[in-house]
Amino acid sequence: MKNKVLENLLDESSIQQQVPFSAGMRFPHLKVPANACDCHHHIYDRRFPVDPNSKLRPPDATVADYRLLQKRLGTVRNVVVQPSTYGVDNSGLIEALNQFDFATTRGVAVVNTSVTDAELKKMDIAGVRAIRFNLSQPGGATSMEMVEPLAERIKAFGWHIQIVANAEQIVTGADIWNRVPVPVVIDHLGHVLSVTHPSFGIIVRLLKRGKGWVKLSGAYIRSKVGPPYSDRTVVAKAYVKEAPDQLVWGSDWPHPTAKIDDKPDDALLLDLLAEWAPDEAIRNRILVNNPSRLYGF
């Protein structure tokens, strides 16, 4: 019996050590509720063609690799986000969704105005529930000008738009976010560096109307102080205080903007949620109820 217990402990330790693109080996201190959802991660697969204009070219980060992360974090549901690496070729995303279970997985695609209704329908069947606009990279596959026409196209599917943009672009696009006929999900805390920045007020007003959502993700991306990212905690706590029912959490694994030898610790990133949202009932909404509403689990 003792040998069996030791064997199980060794198995758990090896799982932690084998999670690629994630620093650290421990399990999170935060025990997540049943059906907890990681609402933002990517899959990279060299079998699929890259966009020649893309800037990020990370190594393969597969479905099998991600499942190891799920074991470490305790999350069950997940949302696969099309990376900028592949532009508007969503074949890798669809392949990844097919490898996951539809009951627990949804996807976010990247398209431009040339996408056909048949292609959108195929994505919908596969589990796609949103399209993403990466406005932070000039010359990328999408642009601000595409947001409104494509939002009109996806309205019939009940999808939303997802925006990754810097704080200034959030301000520039304020009228667009208010006009589009679908929900607006803002990545990575909106890249807001201070609650006094005008972008924070714009986002909070969207949240309070029920029109906007924020992903509590990517704390490491804009942090100037490093782990445990106390400078991002101020902004995250402010979102939780203002609109807890319009927030979801995401790991951003495999952390494509971080250097290969400087990946964040995903256990720490999850544990931050306990600091950002000390109330367990609110955390459970962020991890379970809110993703269920947004992605249709």
PLM regions with names:
Residues 42, 83-84, 110-114, 134-138, ...:
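Active-site beta-loop-alpha junctions enriched in small/polar residues
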Residues 60-69, 114-123, 143-147, 198-199:
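Short, acidic/polar
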Residues 9-15, 144-249:
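Catalytic pocket-lining loop regions of alpha/beta-barrel enzymes
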Residues 51-86, 104-110, 128-136, 159-161:
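Divalent metal-dependent hydrolysis catalytic cores, especially in the metallo-beta-lactamase
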Residues 40, 70, 93, 123, ...:
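Conserved, mostly hydrophobic/aromatic
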Residues 36-41, 78-81, 105-109, 129-133, ...:
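Hydrophobic faces of well-ordered beta-strands that scaffold small-molecule active sites
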Residues 90-108, 239-243, 265-274:
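Short, electropositive alpha-helical surface patch
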Residues 1-35, 59-77, 244-246, 260-297:
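Mid-to-C-terminal alpha-helical segments outside catalytic/metal-binding sites
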